[in-house]
């Protein structure tokens, strides 16, 4: 009898836990994805803060020349970063227990792998939590689908690119100047500015900013006034009101006359779908571009391919970019190799005599 009561009590405790996790009445929805999201993001955030402040220098290139990234080792907020895991580790899974000591783990950049892998798992769970809450509230799943774009972008730079390049040392450093360094090196080695998917990503981000500004300004300019002239028009809105808060017909008419009729949406649902889909598609293209360039399917290279009828090279802006890429690559890992890989791979001319 006692055993039966204990089983019922334990079952009820588990049942109450399940109800609490999946309840939409909580101030913050937990969800089953949240059960995994919370510890992984807490771990990533905690290690990031500690490492950014106090981590010792990391031998990123695997040549016994450690690079400092933390505040206590001479950096500031701008120059500080979590230095990627050493090239000596490559793509090996490198938890603390795989190192001979904590000092060795820190020297080889173990915190970077820990932070990145926990972060990627955490943001993926956040996306799943968005879907889970939408499902329980009877909403459509497109919030999670839109969030998939930045998740894909983060996965591309922190996981897919290192896999393609053969080492976590090629991943993006976790810091401001480290991000810029990653961008410059990426341009030098892959010519990303000449990649169509990057161009589409730029169109998505800047186009999304433009469309959001246009939409917000049109809505703000065509509010249905519910207040007197002495009060702010914003005070006329009540949360949850059934009435329209702005006149879409007026906004449509204004923009249609400003550009042309069919440049303006007359369907609010189509308009907001477009506002969401445009930047999301752009970020997807960028993430796809990073993932393909990870395996060295690089941007266009018109290297001396534009010639006149006599075969003479016509200098173009593409040639200027190629020269800039070589210059940036010379400066990258300057102690690891003395020449750009593009030059070092060329066979030396034969010398007779």
From Swiss-Prot:
Q: Which residues carry this modification: Phosphothreonine?
A: 2
Per UniProt, the keywords (alphabetical) are: Acetylation, Calcium, Chlorophyll, Chromophore, Electron transport, Herbicide resistance, Iron, Magnesium, Manganese, Membrane, Metal-binding, Oxidoreductase, Phosphoprotein, Photosynthesis, Photosystem II, Plastid, Transmembrane, Transmembrane helix, Transport
The residues that the entry says bind chlorophyll a PD1 are 198
One GO cellular-component annotation of the UniProt record comes to: photosystem II
UniProt modified residues of type N-acetylthreonine: 2
Name a GO molecular-function annotation.
Answer: oxygen evolving activity
Which ranges are cleaved off as propeptide?
A: 345-353
Q: Which InterPro entries match?
A: D1/D2, Photo_II_D1/D2_sf, Photo_RC_L/M, Photo_RC_L/M_CS, PSII_D1
User: Where does it reside?
Assistant: Plastid membrane
Residues annotated as binding chlorophyll a ChlzD1 are: 118
Q: Which NCBIfam families match?
A: psbA
Protein name (database record): Photosystem II protein D1
């Amino acid at each position: 009898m006692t055993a039966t009561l204990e089983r019922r009590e334990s079952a009820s405790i588990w049942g109450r836990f399940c109800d609490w996790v999946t309840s939409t009445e909580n101030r913050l929805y937990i969800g089953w994805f949240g059960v995994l999201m919370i510890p992984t993001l807490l771990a990533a955030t905690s290690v990031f803060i500690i490492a950014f402040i106090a981590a010792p220098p990391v031998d990123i290139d695997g040549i016994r020349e450690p690079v400092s990234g933390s505040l206590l080792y001479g950096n500031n907020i701008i120059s500080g970063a979590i230095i990627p895991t050493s090239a000596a580790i490559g793509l090996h899974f490198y938890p603390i227990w795989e190192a001979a000591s904590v000092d060795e783990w820190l020297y080889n950049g173990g915190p970077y792998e820990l932070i990145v892998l926990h972060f990627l798992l955490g943001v993926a769970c956040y996306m799943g939590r968005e879907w889970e809450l939408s499902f329980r509230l009877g909403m459509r799943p497109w919030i999670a689908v839109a969030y998939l774009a930045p998740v894909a972008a983060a996965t591309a730079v922190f996981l897919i690119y290192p896999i393609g390049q053969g080492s976590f040392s090629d991943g993006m450093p976790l810091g401001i100047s480290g991000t810029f360094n990653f961008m410059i090196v990426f341009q030098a080695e892959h010519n990303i500015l000449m990649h169509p998917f990057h161009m589409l990503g730029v169109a998505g981000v800047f186009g999304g900013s433009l469309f959001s500004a246009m939409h917000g300004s049109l809505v703000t300019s065509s509010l249905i006034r519910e207040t007197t002239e002495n009060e702010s028009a914003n005070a006329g809105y009540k949360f949850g009101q059934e009435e329209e808060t702005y006149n879409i017909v007026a906004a449509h008419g204004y923009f249609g006359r400003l550009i042309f009729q069919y440049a303006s949406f007359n369907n609010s649902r189509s308009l907001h779908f477009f506002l969401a889909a445009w930047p999301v598609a752009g970020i997807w293209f960028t993430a796809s571009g990073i993932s393909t360039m990870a395996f060295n399917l690089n941007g266009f290279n018109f290297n001396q391919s534009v010639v006149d009828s006599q075969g003479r090279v016509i200098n173009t802006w593409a040639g200027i970019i190629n020269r800039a890429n070589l210059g940036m690559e010379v400066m990258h890992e300057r102690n690891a190799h003395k020449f750009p890989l593009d030059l070092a791979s060329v066979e030396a001319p034969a010398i007779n005599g």
